[in-house]
């Protein structure tokens, strides 16, 4: 036997290297085979519900790192709630209708207009489902736990029927109407867009300053006067039917020396405009308030058949332009509102593809709207005063990335204005985890217009509306419920397979159809109505869920998307928000803080992370960032997170190794019988338990990460485990001192494994497989630990807080001695302490081997004053010298009692007593050489 064999060197097969990329799929298959999700649900039956409703990602392509962050966050919450006394099911969902899938099929060569519509929709469905299953596998690879066999998909018959019923209730309440209002129109998609489907980019446009000649000045302006107008959309002049001024803005009538014409502009802008137009010696002839100009009539710049009326509008400002805007009610919301109020014609001169129509005039017909500037300039002639290129923020179609226009077309709308206050009141009852989130959603609802819910596409849920022979729209409770029932059985494709009459209830009649003939609507619903109905299609329809949900968790872009549409439909139907809490997340940026883009080549695919680091590192990264704001991710950042993971893993490996001979049923030492330092570590750990439990409850993942890493680095590695080897390696295997420390080790190991499970389930299960005395076969089936408090807890904490200050001072003294070459390692030191009474009392209260705690070979507490050369602090001073004696081959301390023993061992008296008591046979035979 060798002397080193008398040490209790921790042994474990738990590997230092995690091998996550190869091991994770093996564990995941084991969980699936063991039906862990179902077993967890069974354990939680009868417990209070906590329902996190999954916002459905769009089923197209593999998941990106933003998806991963969002879904890992959801998984952490679901797992922590499931282990905290809640029935927390997770039903994953997917959004499957809409233009992107049509675009994919088009790229694959599918020609929609050349094939049967039902066959086309079948192709859309097949593609969408293939993407659902692809993404499902992506999410499962992240280690997510959920009901993967009973997911929800917006294209299933039961879901589509539930969506129709949401629409039906809104129709019954009078919230659905048809109107020809200007809407965001995407010529690239040939469809109307909702606000949630647009994004803003900078765009360079040609702006024109031109003049309309007064035709009837109403006794205020002469007919040789021109009103100066500014526009950034020259094509809309073809549909201009008025000029709008601000009622309270001052306008001036001016005569430039170089002009025979007189002009009207906003007084505040005269100087800048004169410079722009090259006007010199400008004479101000008169000043008018905007309201005085109301109902003056001007000529259209070139269309002699059209007069343009001066009207008043609150949207006119003097921030730019001329303080006067031309008004084309068919091409803008403000224009429409003031135009309708003043009886202006709603002219639309651009078709669905962005091509100018015949009513724009022969010179414009057939041109693309954005290419007509030269023709407009030619038509304006000397009415054009200036032109310039401007860069401004402009709306784009979020899918095609092409600019859009406002365009008045007949559309179906869901009224928001009719119950806006009810929606705002519902927002006040929701808990937002960021105050700005509440403000953002509140302001969006307060300021938004009615919702355009019709789309001129094929792949989606049909609007369940019929038309009588006289054109009357039919959407009664009876007809809508009948359609819902048909969809429930056959799916929405039945709408296209049958004619209108066979989609209506048997024997249905309507006074507007004396011949019994009907037509059906061919528009489909906005996809935001699809996902916005999920509270009904999922929460209401599934017996193991609750409505409203406890939590909606999505990216911050969903304040104008899913949070918004779900809120409107839910309040419209039931008067309540579909969620009790909203938690939002920022976007994922690259390591430099730049937006991720395939074109920039700075994206990170979750699959690449899984291959290089493992999903566990991605999961740990999610907790290491403040996801309420935009967050950065790169392979370098993940490499740093991987180092943190390695530290966590190796610390827990040390605990596993050094409790391998510990049986909690036999070897646990009661708290009251622990040493003071062990009590301190037990209390500190339970403070960590409370911090983590509270943070899980509040979804504060970063708090968990910081607290955990700090505890491992500061409390364990830098202190408790730093001197632990002197106890667990050196002392007798069954000694009280060793069992005391092992009791703390085991308690921390078991509980920290449970606390880590929601974040690092793969690693937690790997650790759990080494804990043979724990009852549950999987840690995921256990409960999170409860924090304990102990008698005299504050007193113990105060004592050890003071000791940590003392320890820091001692370490400074040792460092000075090391720099002076007095010692090398701290174990070479004999530390003499010159304490005042406070420190002396402290060291007595610590009631531990202080030399061991400071990792020095010898320590003396001296009486009297410290020598002049001592390293002094306010309450204590230290001197450091090299310890006397020889290095013990067993404990490595320098000790005066170290000597060669008769059994061929050079060891100190303390080690000799341990060896002689526990290894009599080796002592009798003598130890082998090293």
From Swiss-Prot:
Transcription regulation in keyword set: no
Disulfide bonds: none
One GO term (biological process): isoleucyl-tRNA aminoacylation
Catalytic reactions on record: tRNA(Ile) + L-isoleucine + ATP = L-isoleucyl-tRNA(Ile) + AMP + diphosphate
SUPFAM superfamilies referenced in this protein's UniProt entry, alphabetically: Anticodon-binding domain of a subclass of class I aminoacyl-tRNA synthetases, Nucleotidylyl transferase, ValRS/IleRS/LeuRS editing domain
Keywords: Aminoacyl-tRNA synthetase, ATP-binding, Cytoplasm, Ligase, Metal-binding, Nucleotide-binding, Protein biosynthesis, Zinc
Family as reported in the entry's similarity comment: Belongs to the class-I aminoacyl-tRNA synthetase family. IleS type 1 subfamily.
Protein name stated in the entry: Isoleucine--tRNA ligase
Species annotation: Streptococcus pneumoniae (strain P1031)
Lineage, opening ranks: Bacteria, Bacillati, Bacillota, Bacilli, Lactobacillales
Gene designation: ileS
């Amino acid at each position: 036997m060798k002397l080193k064999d008398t040490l209790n060197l921790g042994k474990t097969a738990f590997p230092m290297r995690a091998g996550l990329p190869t091991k994770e799929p093996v564990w995941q298959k084991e969980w699936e085979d063991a039906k862990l999700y179902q077993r967890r649900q069974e354990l939680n039956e009868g417990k209070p519900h906590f329902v996190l409703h999954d916002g459905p990602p769009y089923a197209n392509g593999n998941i990106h790192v933003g998806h991963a962050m969002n879904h890992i966050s959801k998984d952490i919450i679901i797992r922590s709630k499931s282990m905290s006394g809640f029935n927390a099911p997770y039903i994953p969902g997917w959004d499957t209708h809409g233009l992107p899938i049509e675009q994919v099929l088009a790229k694959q060569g599918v020609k929609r207009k050349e094939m049967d519509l039902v066959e086309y929709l079948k192709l859309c469905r097949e593609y969408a489902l293939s993407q659902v299953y692809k993404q499902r596998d992506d999410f499962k690879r992240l280690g997510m736990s959920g009901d993967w066999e009973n997911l929800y998909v917006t294209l299933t018959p039961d879901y589509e029927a539930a969506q129709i019923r949401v629409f039906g209730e809104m129709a019954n309440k009078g919230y659905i109407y048809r109107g020809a209002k200007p809407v965001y129109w995407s010529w690239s998609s040939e469809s109307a867009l909702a606000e949630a489907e647009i994004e803003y980019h900078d765009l360079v446009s040609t702006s024109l300053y031109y003049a309309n000649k007064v035709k009837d000045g109403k006794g205020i302006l002469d007919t040789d006067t021109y009103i100066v107008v500014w526009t950034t959309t020259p094509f809309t002049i073809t549909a201009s039917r008025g000029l709008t001024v601000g009622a309270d803005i001052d306008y001036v009538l001016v005569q430039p020396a170089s002009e025979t014409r007189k002009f009207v502009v906003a007084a505040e802008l005269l100087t800048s405009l004169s410079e722009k137009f090259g006007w010199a010696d400008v004479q101000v002839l008169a000043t008018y308030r905007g309201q005085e100009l109301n109902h003056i009539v001007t000529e259209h710049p070139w269309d002699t058949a059209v007069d343009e009326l001066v009207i008043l509008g609150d949207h006119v400002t003097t921030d730019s332009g001329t303080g006067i805007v031309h008004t084309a009610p068919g091409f803008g919301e403000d224009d429409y509102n003031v135009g309708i109020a003043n009886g202006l014609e709603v002219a639309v001169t651009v078709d669905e593809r962005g091509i100018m129509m015949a009513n724009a005039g022969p010179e414009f017909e057939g041109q693309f709207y954005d290419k007509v500037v030269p023709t407009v300039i030619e038509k304006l002639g000397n009415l054009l005063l200036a032109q310039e290129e401007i860069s401004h923020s402009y709306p784009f179609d979020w899918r095609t990335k092409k600019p859009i226009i406002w365009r008045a077309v007949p559309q179906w709308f869901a009224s928001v204005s009719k119950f806006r206050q009810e929606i705002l009141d519902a927002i006040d009852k929701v808990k937002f985890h960021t105050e700005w989130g509440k403000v953002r959603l509140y302001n969006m609802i307060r300021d938004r217009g009615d919702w355009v819910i019709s789309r001129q596409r094929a792949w989606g849920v049909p609007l369940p509306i019929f038309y009588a022979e006289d054109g009357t729209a039919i959407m009664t409770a009876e007809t809508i419920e009948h359609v819902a029932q048909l969809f429930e059985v056959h799916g929405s494709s039945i709408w296209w397979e049958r004619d209108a009459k066979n989609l209506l209830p048997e024997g249905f009649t309507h006074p507007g159809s004396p011949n019994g003939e009907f037509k059906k609507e061919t528009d489909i619903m906005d996809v935001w109505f699809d996902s916005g109905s999920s509270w009904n299609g999922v929460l209401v329809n599934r017996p193991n869920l609750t409505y409203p949900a406890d939590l909606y968790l999505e990216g911050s872009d969903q304040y104008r998307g899913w949070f918004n549409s779900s809120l409107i439909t839910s309040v419209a139907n039931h008067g309540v928000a579909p969620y009790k809490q909203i938690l939002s997340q920022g976007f994922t940026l690259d390591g430099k803080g730049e937006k991720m883009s395939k074109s920039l080549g700075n994206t990170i695919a979750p699959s690449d992370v899984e291959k290089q680091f493992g999903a566990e590192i991605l999961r740990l990264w999610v907790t290491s960032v403040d996801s309420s704001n935009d967050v950065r991710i790169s392979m370098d950042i993940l490499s740093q997170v991987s180092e943190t993971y390695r530290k966590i893993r190796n610390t827990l490996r040390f605990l596993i190794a050094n409790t391998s001979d510990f049986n909690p049923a036999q070897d646990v030492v009661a708290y009251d019988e622990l040493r003071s330092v062990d009590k301190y570590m037990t209390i500190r750990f339970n403070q960590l338990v409370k911090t983590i439990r509270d943070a899980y409850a509040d979804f504060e993942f970063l708090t968990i990460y910081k607290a955990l890493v700090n505890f491992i680095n500061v409390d364990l590695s830098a202190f408790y485990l730093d001197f632990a080897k002197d106890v667990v390696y050196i002392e007798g295997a069954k000694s009280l001192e060793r069992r005391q420390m092992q009791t703390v080790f085991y308690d921390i190991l078991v509980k920290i494994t449970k606390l880590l499970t929601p974040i690092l389930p793969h690693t937690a299960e790997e650790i759990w497989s080494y804990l043979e005395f724990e009852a549950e076969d999987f840690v995921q089936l256990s409960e999170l630990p409860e924090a304990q408090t102990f008698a005299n807890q504050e007193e113990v904490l105060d004592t050890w807080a003071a000791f940590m200050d003392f320890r820091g001072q001692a370490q400074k003294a040792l460092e000075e001695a090391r720099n002076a070459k007095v010692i090398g390692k701290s174990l070479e030191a004999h530390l003499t302490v010159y304490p005042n009474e406070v420190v002396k009392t402290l060291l007595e209260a610590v009631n531990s081997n202080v030399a061991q705690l400071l990792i020095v070979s010898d320590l003396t507490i001296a009486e009297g004053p410290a020598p002049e050369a001592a390293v002094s602090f306010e309450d204590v001073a230290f001197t450091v010298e090299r310890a006397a004696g020889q290095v013990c081959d067993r404990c490595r301390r320098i000790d005066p009692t170290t000597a060669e023993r008769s059994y061929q061992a050079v060891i100190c008296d303390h080690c000799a007593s341990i060896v002689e008591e526990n290894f009599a046979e080796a002592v009798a035979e003598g130890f082998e050489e090293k």
